[in-house]
């Protein structure tokens, strides 16, 4: 997952 753009998932929040 590319959290630099799609930071709206549980993976990026953790």
Swiss-Prot record:
> GO terms for molecular function, please?
toxin activity
Family per UniProt?
Belongs to the disintegrin-like family.
What protein name does the entry list?
Answer: RK1 peptide
Q: Which organism is this protein's natural source? A: Buthus occitanus tunetanus
Question: Where on the tree of life does the source sit, at the highest rank?
Answer: Eukaryota
Explain the purpose of this protein.
Venom peptide that completely reduces melanoma (IGR39) cell proliferation at 2 uM dose and reduces more than 90% for glioma (U87) cells. Also reduces melanoma and glioma cell migration and strongly inhibits angiogenesis. May act by binding to integrins.
- The cysteines covalently paired via disulfide bonds are 3-12
What does the record say about tissue specificity? Expressed by the venom gland.
């Amino acid at each position: 997952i590319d959290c630099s753009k799609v930071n709206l998932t549980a993976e990026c929040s953790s």
